[in-house]
Amino acid sequence: LQFKLLREDIQVESVETYDLSSSKQTVSYVRIKNFQIDTSRELRNKLGSLNMVDGVILDLRNNPGGLLEEAIRVSDLFLPGKKRIVSTKGTVVSSVHDAKQLFAGDHLLNIPLVLLINRGSASAAEIVAAALKQNERAIVIGEQSFGKGTVQTLWDLKDGSGLKLTIGE
């Protein structure tokens, strides 16, 4: 038997949303599975019509993390400008990231926000949880998170493999 396979890009959404409604109020439930390229844009697009909701539940349970930049952008959606999101300390590079209001509009800044975490919430998910809690923007509910608190980068090697290196904490 011979097969001819065609390789295609598979787009996996990192954000799921749906509304929880009662006769008195509507709350949007948002699950972020991981922080990959465009997670913040995907979240913003899905929450674009929040005028009719009374609150948001942001579920980061079992979220292993992902891209630091996307964690910063997701946090930025819910924080007014000049609020500290994260600062990293590395042996080579240290940096500070404050909210910049990267996306137009402020409808997400005043909506009540509850954040869910558990022991499976790590890395970028912990950064979002800490930023929103420390800036008194969200109530965090759940278990202690994984406790990773590190920033890693992936280096592509010539043989097609990769090396994941911790570059900050």
Please name every model-derived segment.
Residues 1-158:
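Cleft-lining beta-strand/loop regions that shape enzyme active-site pockets
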Residues 154-155, 165-169:
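Extracytoplasmic/periplasmic membrane-proximal domains and adjacent transmembrane bundles
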